[in-house]
Every structure is written in structure tokens, then in C-alpha cells.
Swiss-Prot record:
Keywords: Acetylation, Cytoplasm, DNA-binding, Isopeptide bond, Methylation, mRNA processing, mRNA splicing, mRNA transport, Nucleus, Phosphoprotein, Repeat, RNA-binding, Transcription, Transcription regulation, Transport, Ubl conjugation. Pfam families: FUBP_C, KH_1. It is found in: Nucleus; Cytoplasm. The keyword Ion transport does not apply. Residues 144-208, 233-299, 322-386, 424-491 form the KH domain. GO terms for cellular component: cytoplasm; cytosol; membrane; nucleoplasm; nucleus. Residues 18-28, 36-68, 408-424 have a biased composition (Gly residues). Part of a ternary complex containing FUBP2, PTBP1, PTBP2 and HNRPH1. Interacts with PARN. Interacts with PQBP1. The modification N-acetylserine is found at S2. The modification Omega-N-methylarginine is found at R40, R411, R413, R415, R442. Residues 110-122 have a biased composition (Basic and acidic residues). This is Far upstream element-binding protein 2. Detected in neural and non-neural cell lines.
Length: 711
């Protein structure tokens, strides 16, 4: 009994395991003593008793830890398991929480239900359990970064794309947020903000480089060095002196636009509003190295020209606009300046080193403006070439009309004193009235297109046809022979038929033949008298007149009579007689009518001969006219005109000898033979136009043969 009283209460029945454990703990509470004392008090083995030996006795050393120490060790083990599960990121934490530990009592849930721990420790344990279960659902956030990237300012639109589709694609494919700065601030590059994971930012940069490289025409992936400090794209700044920034910019920015277009670079004049106007301003030039250098030289040329005092002034060639020169060119001479297939204007541009463009207009004015762009000295050189070319067109070969050349002032009718306009300055053609609309077009668009395409000037004449036929209208084409031929071809394509020449021949004025002015033959412009190339009076006979006053000598005759035409076809001689009687019934005025081969005064000792076919003798009238012309005062500054009076007298004498058959033995009423004269005329026509009449071409029309050919 003393043993029980000393070591603790007597052992209870076996079922209460908890009580036995507590007794054992009480017996082993004091520090372990000598082995004898321990045996006597039953602290280690005896304290366990039959109730607690299976749970606590064997797991603890004699006299060692109780239930509090075991619970702390279990909590530490659970905490370590949770940390391992969190690192693995799997379901290990859940497995650890639901598993039963290898201890002698219940699992974790059983532990929390024990009432031996304070309330705060229970709540902390529950929170740790919930966090371990929610950990796999919310993984830890990845590291994010923001980087500033730069792209060319001109490529921003390409990067954004239509409706922002390109920049959206970059963000979706790379997983990076892309934000572009709204303004470059006058710099050649725009800032782009890239936000995301490092690998996403790197991928977005590669995609931006590819887009910019494709925009510049290079292979993808080669822009990074260019846009961010590379050497393939050059940026150079030159200082513009104070007060000369306006020269570089030009009116409305025209000069700097032309410089950028010609050099193929981008120019930005940096102007700070806070700076003083007397401070030099930097001009930033961006582009390829060679183009940048060329642009710098062009800018310096403009500044140097101003220093020399010549920039912006007007000279004899036209007005300077934005570093260029405007040169007026007569509309009918535009084709000559351009040349066939543009050969002439290309040659001028290559020789002078400039660029020439004709400004668009409505096509109604007498001149077109050729705008020359380039350095000032080269522009002047090109303008000088164009003016020399126009001057050569205005001047014709000198010489009396009886010579082999054309009269001075060009073929046909010229303007003013006959020395204006290129050779072959004007031709008149008849077109059926119902086809005039095809030539003119709606609102005049067709005739304007012909004028612009050929360089000729086509207009409808206000004069009536020579025979007053209302079924035809007269059209006038002015320009060089090449321009006239080109315009004729286009008009013939529109009316689907040939044009009928009307009026004076290429060398002198003369109405159409008696078979009608609308015969579709190429050489029916004049009467079969003297050769047309020498039949007209000298060029200075024409007073100044406008384009509209083309045929002032014509009077509207009676309407066309078919019966008279049939009679004329039956008797050609009678038709020619009627033709001359109608044509020469008008009194000679200030603008004399055409002169057929009038009979010369009879030689000394011979009786006067009547003119053949009823023609009048106008020799004296012509002599008197030329005397009056010679007495008229010349305009100041005009070159002295030669006196062709004697030449014309000699010419008409020779024509009179030809008209009388070559000698006094010829019968007075015989028809003259103009075969040789017509042959010479056609030869000169072929030489002028660069064509050679073939075997079936026009033949000299002597008397009857000429009339049959005209039919």
C-alpha cells in the first residue's frame, strides 16, 4: 500500500486509457532521479500502468516528455509538409492534410478538436490549411517589366495598321502591352512603351523591327540598328542662319517639299517658339547617307544664292518660285519642246541637270507654263535652252519668195508680222457638221485632250466655208508640222474619216479649186497657177491679226448649186474661168487676195496681149502695193526688212512668160503648162515633210490631168 501511496493512485481498470497516461505523467514529472527512486515511485514503467502503456509509455524515455511535447512536434511536422507542398505546387498539401500521421492518436482534424490548445492557435492552424488548399488555384504572379523602345516617326501608321489591327496583332502574339507616344516632339523617332514579361517584350521588339524593315523595303529583322542608333539610316543637322529659315521652307512649305521630293529624304526644321528669332535654327535631314549629302548641298545652294542677291528675283526667263523658274511656252510649240516620245525634254533635263514639268491648265490659253526645278544656275541654263529653241521656231529662212525656200515667217499664215509660230503654223480643215460634236466633246473635253496630247492648238473657226455650205464647219489647227499631223490623226480617228484641207496652201494663200473646197485630196488647196510655195506674197504683207481673223478676204457667196457643180465637172476650163471671176471680183484691200500668175507687161515693141482665160493683170497693183509697204515706217527695234519689189517684178515676168507658153509663138488663148511648177512644189513638200511621193502619189496636174486628179 505504501508503494501505491508514494507513486500515485492505484491502477484503474484497463479501458480508461487516458487516465493511465495521466498517472504515468505524474509519476514521471520530477527530474529523473536515481534508478532506485524511479522504481520505487513508478515514474517510468510503473506510471504507465496498464492503461497508458500502449500509447505513451513505450514512445517516451523514462521520466521524459508528456502530451504537450508530442503535439508541438506534430505541428512542426505538419508545417514542414505544407511548405514542401507549396514549393511543389501540387496537391501534396491536400494529401498531407488528409493523411493520418504515424502517431498514436488521431489525425490533424482530431488534433484541432482537442481542447488543450488555446483558441488563437486553432484559428491559425485552420488558416494555414485553407491557404494550402487555395495555393494551386492562384499561382504566384510572374515578374513584369516596362521598356521604352523607339521607332521611326514615319512608320507609326504602319505599326498601328488599319483600324489598329496591326498593333492588336502584336499585343496578342507577343503577350506584351504596346503603347505609342502620341507625338514625336519634332524628333525623327517616336517612343513606344512595351510592358510585360521579359520574353514578351523581346518578342514585341522583334515584331516591330520586322514591320519597320518591310516598310523600308529591306529584309525583315534589319531595322533595329537603323532605328536605335545604327549606321544604315543617317541623321544630319545643318544650321540655318537667322532670318533665312523662310527660304528653306518657302511659300506654304513649297520649297522644302520640293527639296524632299528631289533628294528623297525627310527634312525637319526645328523651331522653338521660346527662342529668339535671331537664333540659328537646326535643319534635320534623315535618309540614306548619299541622299542626305545631296540634300545638304541643295540647301546650301539656296542659301548661297540668297547671299549673292539673286534668289527670289525675276529675270528674263520667268519668275522663280521655290527655287525654280517658270518659262511661258506657246501652246503650239509645246510639242516641239517635249519632242517625239519626250526625247527633246529629256535631253534638256539631262544637259542642264534639272527637272521640267508643264503645269496643267484648262487648255484655253495661248501659252503653257514650263516649270523648271533645280539649282538656280542650272534652271537658268535650261530656260536659256528652251528660249533658244522657241526663237529658232519663230524665225524662218530668209530670202525672196522666188527662191527655193519657204517665205520668211513659216508656212501658211503666221501671227503678227508673219514671223511668229513654227513652220507650218496653221492648217484649216472642213468637217461635216454632224461630226463636230465628236471632235469637240462634252464641255470641250475632246478638243482639250487633243491639244494637251499633241501640243497643237485646235479650234473651230467662226468663218463660213468658202462655198457657204452649212453642212460643213471649218477647224483650224496651229502648231509645228509634226503637231498638226498628230492632231489630224486623232481627229480622223474620232470622225472615222479623212480631213479635207481648206484654204491656203502650205506656202502661200489660195482658195480651193473649182471642183469644191472639200475634195479629200492632200494637195487641192490652191489654184493650178504658180507653184504654191512661191505663189504667196512675202511674209511682211500681213498686218497684225488675231487667230480668229483667219480668212478676212472671203465674202459669203451664194449657196452651193449642184447644177453648176455638174457643169463645172463637164467643162474644167469653164469652171476655172468661173472660179477666177468669182475670186477676183473683190477689189484689192489692205490685205490683198492671192495672186495667181498674172500676165506681165508686154515686152518692148510688141502689142499688148490679152490675159488668157479672162484673167486680169495685177502686176501694177502689186508693184504699187509693195511701194506703199516699203514707205511704211518700221516699228522701233524691229529688224530692217528687205525690199522684194524688184524680186517680185522679175518673178511675175517669168510667170508671164510661162503663162504665154514660153515664147511669142504660142497662141494667146492656150492653157499654160504648170507641170514643172507643180513638180517643184511637190518636191519641196516631200523634202519638208520628210516623205517621198511614191509612184501612186500626187502628180503634177497639167491642164486636164490636174482637174481629173482633183476629182
Amino acid at each position: 500500500m505504501s508503494d501505491y501511496s508514494t507513486g500515485g493512485p492505484p491502477p484503474g481498470p484497463p479501458p480508461p486509457a487516458g487516465g493511465g497516461g495521466g498517472a504515468g505523467g505524474a509519476g514521471g514529472g520530477p527530474p529523473p532521479g536515481p534508478p532506485g527512486a524511479g522504481d520505487r515511485g513508478g515514474g517510468g514503467p510503473g506510471g504507465g500502468g496498464p492503461g497508458g502503456g500502449s500509447a505513451g509509455g513505450p514512445s517516451q524515455p523514462p521520466g521524459g516528455g508528456g502530451p504537450g511535447i508530442r503535439k508541438d512536434a506534430f505541428a512542426d511536422a505538419v508545417q514542414r509538409a505544407r511548405q514542401i507542398a507549396a514549393k511543389i505546387g501540387g496537391d501534396a498539401a491536400t494529401t498531407v492534410n488528409n493523411s493520418t500521421p504515424d502517431f498514436g492518436f488521431g489525425g490533424q482534424k482530431r488534433q484541432l478538436e482537442d481542447g488543450d490548445q488555446p483558441e488563437s492557435k486553432k484559428l491559425a492552424s485552420q488558416g494555414d490549411s485553407i491557404s494550402s488548399q487555395l495555393g494551386p488555384i492562384h499561382p504566384p504572379p510572374r515578374t513584369s517589366m516596362t521598356e521604352e523602345y523607339r521607332v521611326p516617326d514615319g512608320m507609326v501608321g504602319l505599326i498601328i495598321g488599319r483600324g489598329g489591327e496591326q498593333i492588336n496583332k502584336i499585343q496578342q502574339d507577343s503577350g506584351c502591352k504596346v503603347q505609342i507616344s502620341p507625338d514625336s516632339g519634332g524628333l525623327p523617332e517616336r517612343s513606344v512603351s512595351l510592358t510585360g514579361a521579359p520574353e514578351s517584350v523581346q518578342k514585341a521588339k522583334m515584331m516591330l523591327d520586322d514591320i519597320v524593315s518591310r516598310g523600308r523595303g529591306g529584309p525583315p529583322g534589319q531595322f533595329h540598328d537603323n532605328a536605335n542608333g545604327g549606321q544604315n539610316g543617317t541623321v544630319q543637322e545643318i544650321m540655318i542662319p537667322a532670318g533665312k529659315a523662310g527660304l528653306v521652307i518657302g511659300k506654304g512649305g513649297e520649297t522644302i517639299k520640293q527639296l524632299q521630293e528631289r533628294a528623297g529624304v525627310k527634312m525637319i526644321l526645328i523651331q522653338d517658339g521660346s527662342q529668339n528669332t535671331n537664333v540659328d535654327k537646326p535643319l534635320r535631314i534623315i535618309g540614306d547617307p548619299y541622299k542626305v549629302q545631296q540634300a545638304c548641298e541643295m540647301v546650301m545652294d539656296i542659301l548661297r544664292e540668297r547671299d549673292q542677291g539673286g534668289f527670289g528675283d525675276r529675270n528674263e526667263y520667268g519668275s522663280r518660285i521655290g527655287g525654280g523658274i517658270d518659262v511661258p511656252v506657246p501652246r503650239h510649240s509645246v510639242g516641239v519642246v517635249i519632242g517625239r516620245s519626250g526625247e527633246m525634254i529629256k535631253k534638256i533635263q539631262n544637259d542642264a541637270g534639272v527637272r521640267i514639268q508643264f503645269k496643267q491648265d484648262d487648255g484655253t490659253g495661248p501659252e503653257k507654263i514650263a516649270h523648271i526645278m533645280g539649282p538656280p544656275d542650272r534652271c537658268e541654263h535650261a530656260a536659256r535652252i528652251i528660249n533658244d529653241l522657241l526663237q529658232s521656231l519663230r524665225s524662218g529662212p530668209p530670202g525672196p519668195p522666188g527662191g527655193p525656200g519657204m517665205p520668211p515667217g513659216g508656212r501658211g499664215r503666221g501671227r503678227g508680222q508673219g514671223n511668229w509660230g513654227p513652220p507650218g503654223g496653221e492648217m484649216t480643215f472642213s468637217i461635216p457638221t454632224h461630226k463636230c460634236g465628236l471632235v469637240i466633246g462634252r464641255g470641250g473635253e475632246n478638243v482639250k485632250a487633243i491639244n494637251q496630247q499633241t501640243g497643237a492648238f485646235v479650234e473651230i473657226s467662226r468663218q463660213l466655208p468658202p462655198n457657204g455650205d452649212p453642212n460643213f464647219k471649218l477647224f483650224i489647227i496651229r502648231g509645228s508640222p509634226q503637231q498638226i499631223d498628230h492632231a489630224k490623226q486623232l481627229i480622223e480617228e474620232k470622225i472615222e474619216g479623212p480631213l479635207c484641207p481648206v484654204g491656203p496652201g502650205p506656202g502661200g494663200p489660195g482658195p480651193a479649186g473649182p471642183m469644191g473646197p472639200f475634195n479629200p485630196g492632200p494637195f487641192n488647196q490652191g489654184p493650178p497657177g504658180a507653184p504654191p510655195h512661191a505663189g504667196g506674197p512675202p511674209p511682211h504683207q500681213y498686218p497684225p491679226q488675231g487667230w480668229g481673223n483667219t480668212y478676212p478676204q472671203w465674202q459669203p457667196p451664194a449657196p452651193h448649186d449642184p447644177s453648176k457643180a455638174a457643169a463645172a465637172a463637164a467643162d474644167p476650163n469653164a469652171a476655172w474661168a468661173a472660179y477666177y471671176s468669182h475670186y477676183y471680183q473683190q477689189p484689192p484691200g489692205p490685205v490683198p487676195g492671192p495672186a495667181p500668175a498674172p500676165a506681165a507687161p508686154p515686152a518692148q515693141g510688141e502689142p499688148p496681149q490679152p490675159p488668157p482665160t479672162g484673167q486680169s493683170d495685177y502686176t501694177k497693183a502689186w508693184e504699187e502695193y509693195y511701194k506703199k509697204i516699203g514707205q511704211q515706217p518700221q516699228q522701233p527695234g524691229a529688224p530692217p526688212q528687205q525690199d522684194y519689189t524688184k524680186a517680185w517684178e522679175e518673178y511675175y515676168k517669168k510667170q508671164a512668160q510661162v503663162a504665154t507658153g514660153g515664147g511669142p509663138g504660142a497662141p494667146p488663148g492656150s492653157q499654160p503648162d504648170y507641170s514643172a511648177a507643180w513638180a517643184e512644189y511637190y518636191r519641196q513638200q516631200a523634202a519638208y515633210y520628210g516623205q517621198t511621193p511614191g509612184p501612186g502619189g500626187p502628180q503634177p496636174p497639167p491642164t486636164q490631168q490636174g482637174q481629173q486628179q482633183a476629182q
